[in-house]
Amino acid sequence: MRPYELMVIIDPEVEERTVEPSLQKFLNVITNDGGTIEKVDIWGRRRLAYDIKKKSEGIYAVVNFTAKPETAKELDRQLSLNETIMRTKITRPEEQKVVAE
């Protein structure tokens, strides 16, 4: 199991109160495969740096989770198939490096 961070940009036409329940459907992939979800942080509506699908705004959400690499790939695949998801990015956070003095 490895730690991951998922950033999702959701279509701004989706109501903000329905963002978390719809995200939860996708996050069930992680929990069903034995992974854990540490934190779901919905940033809300933000301006995009450049237009995506002719839209200048998006609803941002960041999820920290622990899962197997195959589970992370499957989650990314399922998110990319959904039309309300504009962009996804899954990264592995850098390990905290301890500096000896």
Curated annotation (Swiss-Prot):
- Please give the InterPro entries that the UniProt record associates with this protein: Ribosomal_bS6, Ribosomal_bS6_CS, Ribosomal_bS6_sf, Ribosomal_S6_plastid/chlpt, Transl_elong_EF1B/ribsomal_bS6
This protein's UniProt keywords: Ribonucleoprotein, Ribosomal protein, RNA-binding, rRNA-binding
Q: GO CC: one term?
A: ribonucleoprotein complex
Record GO biological process: translation
Matching entries from Pfam families are given as: Ribosomal_S6 (PF01250)
Assigned protein family: Belongs to the bacterial ribosomal protein bS6 family.
The protein's job, in short, is:
Binds together with bS18 to 16S ribosomal RNA.
NCBIfam families in the cross-refs: S6
From the Swiss-Prot or TrEMBL record, give the protein name: Small ribosomal subunit protein bS6
